[in-house]
Structure formats: structure tokens, C-alpha cells
Amino acid sequence: MNNNSIEYRKLEHLIVCDHCDVEYKKGTLLEDVELIHSGISNCDLDDIDTSIEIFGKKLNAPLIVAAITGGHPKAKEVNKNIAIAVEELNLGMGVGSQRAAISKSYLEDTYSVVRDHTSSLIIGNLGAVNFVEDSWDEEIISKSVEMIDADAMAIHFNPLQEAIQPEGDVNFKGLNILKEIISNYNKIHGKIPFIAKQVGEGFSKKDAIFLKEIGFDAIDVGGSGGTSWAAVELYRIKDEEQKNFSNQYFNWGIPTAASILEVNSAFSGPIIATGGIRTGIDIAKSISIGANCCGTALPILKAALKSSEAVTTVLERMIKELKTTMFLTGCNNINELKSARYILKGDLKNWKDQI
């Protein structure tokens, strides 16, 4: 196998994320969101409803397993374990970039395995840069949707990762072609929700305006504070000078909470909060400041490398924390949580004042 192949790279990413310190050294700024405790609660904890509807699917909680992997036999096992847990809890999940299976059809089952184990919300995944670099069109989207019977399609934007990755594609000029491609897909193949997805560096207000004009239905902010792809690529790089270069961007990006505020100021569609979402409290805070749903990846990857039961345990813990936080803020359902009172402090307050 060529060590520079996409397939090998997918395996490297799994190994690095499981064994190395790849998380940002700075936080998500969710620590600057203070939910106001309700001393009387006026709720029955057992009756609190965490369910939402998004992309035509009802989920038992506003929680999606964010895009992680695909494209290697080991990835098939990970996706299978996640899908089993998602089906049990009626949540959603995304798959990793499907580029590997576009170029090598024998890798399709590392993605399609998810539909063997769940009928819940599945989100496909393609890279924005490939529509420029490789002249992808709506038929590539169609193939990717069919591969996993996707309910929605994420188009990920990862300029930092591509700039640092030894084999990266760095021509992000001309992304406005996505407007025609998305429109063509919807006309030819039937409408599907399109999600603009960041992968750890966040979207700004300016980005949100552009993405809205392109025709995206939802935005996954993918803010900083969780997994740093600069860190992931740092561990893959062999050249010392390139390592030092990559290390300069270890903490680059818009923190998740700030990106939620940035996007929410210019975009009215669903907002998914990813990037350092580790607890149910993080979910509650994200929703209170403007997100509709949240996603988490790294803790799930580590669990999925063990078993589906381990994935279920992590997700159940987060849902329990979310329900408890709603109970402590007097919120009976997610709509009430969206209106929960909070105080912004420190850097996040300063950030909001300058949007």
C-alpha cells in the first residue's frame, strides 16, 4: 500500500486521535456562558423532554455523533459501533469524508455499514475543496448520498488542515460554484438538506453570509476547542521544519461558542454546534446561545474503537447531564432551553460586543 494513499491516511488519523494529545490548549469559550440556576426548578426531572426534529427526523436528544471516519477497514468497525449505539438511543450520526470511496469503490462498505445498523439520521460528507480541485459535480453528491442513504449532506471546509497536510489541496478559490452544484442536485435528484461544516476552526459572520447565499440549509460551526487538525497533522509530519510550522497553528480558530454567536447573527437556518462538546452542560449552553443541535466526535471515536456498548455509555452520560442541566434551569423541553436565561462573561462577552 502506498503510504500516501487516502486509505492509509484514514488509518493514521484514527491512530493519532486515539493515542496522541490532539485537543486544543484553549477552550471553546462555553466556559464563559453561565446558565442561571433555577432554585425552584418547577420541573419533574423524569418528564423532561430532550427530543428535537431536524432534517426531517425526530431525535431523542439534540445530539449527533459528528463525522469521524471511513475509508479503511478499521473505520468500518468504528462506524458500525457508532451506528448500533445511535440506533439504540435514536440519535443522529455523520460519516467521515467519502472521498476515499469515490476514488476506490471497494471502500464503500466502510461507510454504507452504517445503514446495516441504523435507520436514524445519517449525514453524508464531502470536501468543499474537491469541487474546485477535482471538478466534482452534483453526480458525485448523488453517489455519496446513495452510498449511505443519507438524510442530509455535509460539505466540509478545512483550509487549515489542507494547508498543513503534506498532501493537502489548497485551492479554495471559486467556491461559489457550489451554488450551482447544490441547485442542480436538488433539481435533478430531489431536495436534500445541505450542511456547511467546519472541522475545528469555526465559521465567522462573514462566512455565514456567504454560505447562506450559496444555498446551504444548515451550518455546523465546527469551532475550536476540541480536536485540532493542525495537531493531528503535526503527528503525521516527518520533517522537523514542517512540524514547527504546523505547531504554530495548534490553537488557531474561532472558539465554538464565539462561532455560534457569529453564525447566529447572520443565519436563520439550523445551527449545529461541534468542536469540544464533551458534556451535557456543553450541549445546554450551546443551545441556549443559539445552536439547534450539537455534535461530538473524539470521545465517541475512543469509545467506538472498543465497542458499541462503550459508545452508548458515553452518549447516555451526555444525555443524562443535559436533562439534569435542563432540570436545574427550569426547562421542560428544548424550546424552553432555547429561551433559558444566561450571562456571558469574559472573552465571550467581549467577542459578542464586537460582532
Curated annotation (Swiss-Prot):
Catalytic activity: isopentenyl diphosphate = dimethylallyl diphosphate
Keyword Flavoprotein: yes
Subcellular location: Cytoplasm
List of residues binding FMN: 67-69, 97, 125, 197, 227, 276-278, 297-298
Listed GO MF terms: FMN binding; isopentenyl-diphosphate delta-isomerase activity; magnesium ion binding; NADPH binding; oxidoreductase activity
Matches recorded under InterPro entries: Aldolase_TIM (IPR013785), FMN-dep_DH (IPR000262), IPdP_isomerase (IPR011179)
Cellular compartments per GO CC: cytoplasm
Keyword vocabulary terms for this entry: Cytoplasm, Flavoprotein, FMN, Isomerase, Isoprene biosynthesis, Magnesium, Metal-binding, NADP
UniProt-listed Enzyme Commission number(s): 5.3.3.2
Residues annotated as binding Mg(2+): 162
Metal-binding as UniProt keyword: yes
Family of this protein: Belongs to the IPP isomerase type 2 family.
Matching PANTHER family: ISOPENTENYL-DIPHOSPHATE DELTA-ISOMERASE
Protein name, as recorded: Isopentenyl-diphosphate delta-isomerase
